[in-house]
Amino acid sequence: YLEEESFCQKVECHDSIDSTNIRGKQLAELGEAEGTLIVADRQTAGRGRRGRNWISESGVGIYMTYVLRPTVQPAHVSGITLLAALAMCEATYQECDVLPQIKWPNDVIIDGKKICGILTEMSSEVQYVHYAVMGIGINANKEKFDETLKDKATSIYLSTGKKVNRAKFTAAFADAFGGYYRRYMQDGDLSAFVEEYDELLANKDKEVIIYHGMVEDATPDKISRGIARGIDKDGALLVEIDGSVTPVMSGEVSIRGVQGYV
């Protein structure tokens, strides 16, 4: 299903694996070329942002990781996560005729519930990136979530009533991401994508709560409120607090809506 000029140069498939990101890092360390895609039907040790567990059942999800060799500075690698979210929205619209939204920086949502998570990791020096891996876990055809998750997570199938062809969806995402990524490497910043991202931003012009550190561990002095105004060319969330706009970087904070997750 991949395009002829696809950014994806090679696909490695697994029935079961500990984590596609772990495998991606192993391959990158061994010199694997950029554009190699690792796909698994099931993960036994999938992880989300800040080390959180990601449940990866067989037969219902899409779990994949791209091996990347970015030419941008290490500080700009986090922008890859935002582009993956854009690619996820594009693939969902193309394959399922539904346009999701993005909860900055790395969650793609339908009707306020999460359908995927994205985790980008890198090996770098101060001014140089050796490699990065961009992993994405997608709730595609999952039919049921347990009580602790059902208020903030859903699947494409539960949201749309349409079963996802996982191979076609994987190809649609891989091709969409490749186009965004090539442009990012060419430009060096996210200027070309700010408008598109802001249109899909679920929290735009809404009040958000900013947790400096982990949400679970936040003390009152580590919590602030503001209005989300969009992103800048570096991928920071622009938050208006007491009339002045401050850029907030994704590695430092977690964002929640005033009414809950979004």
What are these regions (language model features)?
Residues 6-7, 76, 82-100, 110-262:
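Long, positively charged amphipathic alpha-helical accessory segments at protein N-termini or as interdomain linkers
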